[in-house]
Structures are given as structure tokens and as C-alpha cells.
Amino acid sequence: MSARRFLFLLVVTSLIAASLAAPKDVQMTKRGTPCWCGQTKGVYWYWMRKCPSGYGYTGNCYHFMGRCCYPAGS
């Protein structure tokens, strides 16, 4: 097998694996994961500088490469 053919098959396999691993549900791509700001439980948003609007967040703290956002009374 030539090196070109091997690289082509590697790229095709990688694209197929990436498409299967991507979430199909729109809601899955828009929600965060649980996190903690000290004693307060929040939602972690990856690669965000500030909390997204429309979710009722009143506070946040920095986490590695993202934000942990929490609503009032959490």
C-alpha cells in the first residue's frame, strides 16, 4: 500500500469517526456541564468569556478555558 493511499484512508476514517462522535441533537450542543464556584453549583461553558444571556445567570467564576455560571439562589 502506498503512503498516499494510506494517508487518504486515514483522513477518511478520521472524518467518519468525527462525524459519528458529534452530537446530533441541537440541545446537546447548547448546554453546559456541571461545575462548582466554591460552594455554588453552576454550569460550565467551554471557551466562553462571559455567561450566555437568556439563562438567568447572576454570577460566574473562571474555570480552565471557560466559565462556570450560576443562577441566583444556587
Curated annotation (Swiss-Prot):
Question: What Pfam families does the entry give?
Answer: Defensin_4 (PF07936)
Write one Gene Ontology MF term. ion channel inhibitor activity
Transmembrane domains' residue ranges:
none
Which stretches are tagged as propeptide in the UniProt entry? Answer: 22-29
Which keywords are on file for this protein? Cleavage on pair of basic residues, Disulfide bond, Ion channel impairing toxin, Nematocyst, Neurotoxin, Potassium channel impairing toxin, Secreted, Signal, Toxin, Voltage-gated potassium channel impairing toxin
Note the SS bond partners. 35-68, 37-61, 51-69
Q: Which GO terms describe its cellular component?
A: extracellular region; nematocyst
Cellular compartment(s): Secreted; Nematocyst
The secretion signal range is: 1-21
Q: What does this protein do?
A: Potently and selectively inhibits voltage-gated potassium channels Kv11/KCNH/ERG. Acts as a gating-modifier toxin that shifts the voltage-dependence of ERG activation in the positive direction and suppresses its current amplitudes elicited by strong depolarizing pulses that maximally activate the channels.
Q: Which family does it belong to?
A: Belongs to the sea anemone type 3 (BDS) potassium channel toxin family.
User: What is the recorded name of this protein?
Assistant: U-actitoxin-Bgr3b
